[in-house]
Amino acid sequence: MTKFSFKKWGGYSLLFIEIIFFILFPERIQASTLVLAGINQNPNNELSKLLPFVNYLAHHLQSDGFDKGSVRIEKTIPPIATLMKKGKIDLFLGGPFTSVALHQLAKTNFLLQGITEGSDKHYSVIFVRNDSSVKHLKDLKGKVIAFENPLSTFGYSLPKGLMLERGLKFKLLKTDKENVAPDEVAYQFSNDDENTILWVKKGKVIAGAVDYEIYKLQAKETLDQLRIIEKTISLPPYIISFRENLSPEVVSHLKEVLKKMHQTDEGKAVLKNLNEIWKFQDFSQRTLSPFMKLYDSFSGEFKVK
């Protein structure tokens, strides 16, 4: 006759309970690290901004099973898209261009917009020297314009998209000695908005495109040397997105934490370090519709590599 062992069956019962809990609440057991991704050509610089931010979020999401934060920095979009689809990256913080590209590649969801103090929407300006003969965008045919870098929203994709809509054709200059056809606009990457403004001032290029907020800040007392010939639509400066299949409970708590960050001294300090973001707030995704249409129409021009 087999004797009943309470200890043995008690162990099975405990195991059964753990399995049920694992099935019902996988986020609470598996996800101990909240992973945030960013894109930058200088990983160390971006890491110093993003790590305090994601650690702050993880600390306030302990009830959801997170005990620490981690940052993944890439120089291009596809690696982040791949990892988000695999569930290895939870969040992404970036500008509209990179956020929309990830949405298209990895089916990410937009959560909130990050705004700077005094402005919840930014726009690009296309400018020339005040003594330039260029008055309109069409006058840039046969000339050279400076953009920031291929992943910049306000320093590249937004102003270039506007010019594409106006029927202008582009050519990327690989050297300063290349010829520019009279029916196309040539462009070079300055790799920094400050460089873009400087290049225009010194006559290295005829025109430049930057975020208007940066234009006001960088040009400073020399604004009278420059002249704006066109401006773009307005977009949120920053967007935080989350991966597909992230728990709705986590998303809800995350949204609450983000929207309250600016109300505490600790949160304010973290935000100030994060590209001078003032606070996170709701936004209508319809705000992005014109840009998403632009992205779809000219996706071949904005090669996501």
Indicate residue ranges for each PLM-predicted region:
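Periplasmic-binding protein-like
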Residues: S32-N40, L112-V128, V180-D183, Q218-H262, ...
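Alpha-to-beta junction loops
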Residues: K85-G94, K143-I145, E184, D192, ...
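Extracytoplasmic small-molecule ligand-binding "clamshell" domains
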Residues: A31-V100
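Bacterial N-terminal signal peptides
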Residues: S13-I23
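N-terminal secretory signal peptides that target proteins for export/translocation
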Residues: M1-K8
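Bilobed "Venus flytrap"/periplasmic-binding protein-like clamshell domains
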Residues: L34-H60, F97, H122-I197, A269
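A ligand-binding cleft/hinge motif common to bilobed small-molecule-binding domains
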Residues: L93-A106, P159-E165, I197-Q225
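Ligand-binding clefts/hinges and TM-proximal coupling segments of bilobed small-molecule sensing domains
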Residues: D67-S70, F147-L162, L258-K305
